[in-house]
UniProtKB/Swiss-Prot annotation:
UniProt name for this protein: ATP synthase subunit beta
UniProt xrefs under SMART domains: AAA
GO molecular function, one term: proton-transporting ATP synthase activity, rotational mechanism
Catalytic reaction equation(s): ATP + H2O + 4 H(+)(in) = ADP + phosphate + 5 H(+)(out)
Gene: atpD
Quaternary data: F-type ATPases have 2 components, CF(1) - the catalytic core - and CF(0) - the membrane proton channel. CF(1) has five subunits: alpha(3), beta(3), gamma(1), delta(1), epsilon(1). CF(0) has three main subunits: a(1), b(2) and c(9-12). The alpha and beta chains form an alternating ring which encloses part of the gamma chain. CF(1) is attached to CF(0) by a central stalk formed by the gamma and epsilon chains, while a peripheral stalk is formed by the delta and b chains.
Length: 467
């Protein structure tokens, strides 16, 4: 084990000099030694080697606060990448980027440790999946169904409901699924992590979830690596032959941490100031989130969209890797329709008659056609009013407005602030309800009857009460 000394410290980037014949490899973990003198530097602070500068000097990223560091402090080389505990000992626990417990519930009883940098599975080990994963959320099950073992992205700007949608999916899938889940909180609010922990605890599914957090108050090194820590734990369960759910909130913060690190390392920025290695970093993470012949990882990722611009390099790079994209729209949220999913922008590879069946496919496409027609007529209505439309168009607008309201749904996780109990709608009920709407069987019902209900039967009951 070689010992080096700190020669330069700029924010989270620390240069450390080692003997020339004992230079650490890229991605090796280094640990700050106790020099015996008074300093408020974090004890046992870890560093990850990013670059070899020559003459025995390596450039590293501190995985923790670099406050209190100074030149000349001794640092030892562990000779291996960062390794984190994996296996059943991690379930029900909250850990940081290095796999250390932060829930004050004692040490983690894991027999095995695994390096966070792993190769993606080989091509011949991959297993394509066409099984559908029912979420109980009407708009998602209808227009952008999820695949078991697939990758899903929840795209949205600030405050349109990504985290609430993520929580509802965890509530509906993790509880129904009864399998194991891993949650990686990447650069999000600590309060949300706390809410998530208590939500899981109250639902009695805490013993099936491993939680890893690198929140927004942490240095960029932690936020950059915490997604890999969570993924390493999920991969271990997958390699056991299990079906795993892997939740990431938020992938954009992973990119942002990469941007901060890249700038500190002195790389030339590319478009919009992002790191030049954006596509490679995203690919390294996403290619590992995959299903093999032994087990599957179904991944649900929240993706923040800066300034609601889906063409921004970060969300645009994420799009490439996903099977389903759920786009949350500010315009729909402004109408008070929650979940604010845009049924025209959201897509899924699974929406194929050979996978979902002809009936589901046709109903989904007819719903989208009706909504698209309404979108086209909106300008005419705004200028000339409804009276100028042809009878067919009036009918289409009436149906579209009912469909729009029927796409709303009360959530279990939002019961506290909506006051209405959450609804889980099975896929068959969802298809039946929308089929009746597009077939004109509900033309006589008022629009309000469809707002914030579960199944179509509830809409009929609500209509009776409104009369």
């Amino acid at each position: 084990m070689s010992i080096g000394t700190i020669v330069q410290c700029i924010g989270a980037v620390v240069d450390i000099q080692f003997p020339r014949d004992a230079m650490p490899k890229v991605y090796d973990a280094l640990v700050l030694q106790d020099s015996g003198e008074a300093s408020f530097a974090e004890k046992g602070l870890s560093f990850e080697v990013q670059q070899q500068l020559g003459d025995g000097v390596v450039r590293t990223i501190a995985l923790g606060s670099s406050d209190g560091l100074r030149r000349g402090m001794p640092v030892s080389n562990t000779g291996a990448p960062i390794s984190v505990p994996v296996g059943h000992g991690t379930l029900g626990r909250i850990m940081d980027v290095l796999g250390r417990p932060i829930d004050e519930a004692g040490p983690i009883a894991a027999d095995e440790k695994r390096a966070i940098h792993q190769k993606a599975p080989k091509f011949d080990e991959l297993s394509p999946s066409v099984d559908l994963l029912e979420t109980g959320i009407k708009v998602i099950d209808l227009v952008c169904p999820f695949a078991k073992g697939g990758k899903v992205g929840l795209f949205g700007g600030a405050g349109v409901g990504k985290t609430v949608n993520m929580m509802e999916l965890i509530n509906n899938i993790a509880k129904q699924h009864s399998g194991l889940s891993v949650f990686a909180g990447v650069g999000e609010r600590t309060r949300e992590g706390n809410d998530f922990y208590h939500e899981m605890k109250d639902s009695n599914v805490l013993d099936k979830v491993a939680m890893v957090f690198g929140q927004m108050n942490e240095p960029p090194g932690n936020r950059l690596r915490v997604a890999l820590t969570g993924l390493t734990m999920a991969e271990r369960f997958r390699d056991e032959g299990r079906d795993i759910l892997f939740f990431v909130d938020n992938i954009y913060r992973y990119t942002l941490a990469g941007t901060e690190v890249s700038a500190l390392l002195g790389r030339m920025p590319s478009a919009v100031g992002y790191q030049p290695t954006l596509a490679e970093e995203m690919g390294k993470l996403q290619e590992r989130i995959t299903s093999t012949k032994t087990g599957s990882i179904t991944s649900i990722q929240a993706v923040y969209v800066p300034a609601d611009d889906l063409t921004d390099p970060s969300p645009a790079t994420t799009f490439l890797h996903l099977d389903s994209t759920v786009v949350l729209s500010r315009d729909i949220a402004a109408l008070g329709i929650y979940p604010a999913v845009d049924p025209l922008d959201s897509t899924s590879r699974q929406l194929d008659p050979q996978i979902v069946g002809t009936e589901h496919y046709e109903v989904a496409r007819r719903v989208q056609q009706t909504l698209q027609r309404y979108k086209e007529l909106r300008d005419i209505i705004a200028i000339l009013g409804m009276d100028e439309l042809s009878p067919e168009d009036k009918l289409a607008v009436g149906r579209a407005r009912k469909i729009q309201r029927f796409l709303s749904q009360p959530f279990h996780v939002a019961e506290v602030f909506t006051g209405s109990p959450g609804k889980y709608v099975p896929l068959k009920e969802t298809i039946r309800g929308f089929k009746m709407l597009v077939d004109g069987e509900c033309d006589h019902l008022p629009e309000q009857a469809f707002y914030m209900v579960g199944s179509i039967d509830e809409a009929f009951e609500k209509a009776k009460k409104l009369q």
